[in-house]
């Protein structure tokens, strides 16, 4: 059994390197999951700026739409975990994001929860963090010497009909997509979703943008890993399995189907090392400050020295 395991590792390791580099991505690819979200409030300006500063390949974000049609970066279906919605709008904390206008969301504090939950990582400036419009995330992504990659998930897309077309329209307006629906620069844009239907919609409106089919445990149990790999081959460029489905025998099957493998969400040093040994092509991580140097992508940086350079905790409004 041990010999068989080593055989899988040998066959799978680095087999996705050429395909990754052909897309213009660094290898192994580091996706800053909701930004550098171990060290700063998730999906806020400071989290994404820090991810840029430590050298993540992609800024990962969950895209939802407000009641009045504004695209925002937010993970949860409701606002209660990561904002002060219960204080600002009493009785509405269980309402979905889509029940709020952008003007309402802009009033919320999106950082104080982090200080309360992780006092050892708290910083006073986090209390001024705000929810980001996708336009504001694009401002951050375009602020460096070269554009940062964006790895964008349609979150609960069944609740937001047409969100794929809305997203593509905004990205084209901001210069991330050509009129033909291709990334303007190689390696700067990926779409991802747990929804096969959403990925099919992206095939229609922006067929040339790489697409990743996200897989969770319930999907694998219900449909089977091989069935999902076959579906992913028809839907795009790769899979994003929950981390424990990145074992080398799973990774090898995906590679043999011509798919890249980007497991989520790996935050411990041993997880990152093991995933790399298993032959994955990249990882989603809250700890891009660890993954980037561990994968030999760039030298480690002193994060404490970066904070003064990262600017305001929220966009100017």
Residues covered by each model-derived region:
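Phosphate-group recognition and catalysis centered on beta-loop-alpha active-site segments
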Residues: 2-317
């Amino acid at each position: 059994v041990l010999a068989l395991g080593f055989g899988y590792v040998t066959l799978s390791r680095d087999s996705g390197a050429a395909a990754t580099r052909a897309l213009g991505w660094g290898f192994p690819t580091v996706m800053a999951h909701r930004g550098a979200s171990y060290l700063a409030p998730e999906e806020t300006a400071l989290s994404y700026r820090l991810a840029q500063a430590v050298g993540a390949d992609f800024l990962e974000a969950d895209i939802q739409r407000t009641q009045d049609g504004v695209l925002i970066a937010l993970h949860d279906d409701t606002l209660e975990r990561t904002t002060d919605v219960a204080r600002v709008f009493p009785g509405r904390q269980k309402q979905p994001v889509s029940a709020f206008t952008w003007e309402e969301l802009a009033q919320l504090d999106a950082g104080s929860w982090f200080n309360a939950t992780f006092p050892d990582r708290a910083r006073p400036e986090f209390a001024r963090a705000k929810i980001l419009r996708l336009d504001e995330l694009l401002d951050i992504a375009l602020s460096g010497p070269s554009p940062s990659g964006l790895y964008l998930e349609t979150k609960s897309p069944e609740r937001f009909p047409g969100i794929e077309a809305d997203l593509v329209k905004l990205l084209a307006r901001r210069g991330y997509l050509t009129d033909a629906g291709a990334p303007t620069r190689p390696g700067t844009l990926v779409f991802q979703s747990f929804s096969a239907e959403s990925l099919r919609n992206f095939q229609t409106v922006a067929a040339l943008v790489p697409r990743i089919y996200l897989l969770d445990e319930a999907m694998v149990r219900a449909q089977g890993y091989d069935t999902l790999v076959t579906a992913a081959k028809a839907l795009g460029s790769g899979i994003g399995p929950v981390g424990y489905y990145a074992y080398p025998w799973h990774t090898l099957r995906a590679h043999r189907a011509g798919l890249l493998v980007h497991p989520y969400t790996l935050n411990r040093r041993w997880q990152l090392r093991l995933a790399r040994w298993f032959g994955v092509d990249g990882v989603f991580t809250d700890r891009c400050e660890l993954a980037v140097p561990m994968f030999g992508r760039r030298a480690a940086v002193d994060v404490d020295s970066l904070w003064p350079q990262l600017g305001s905790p929220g966009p100017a409004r």
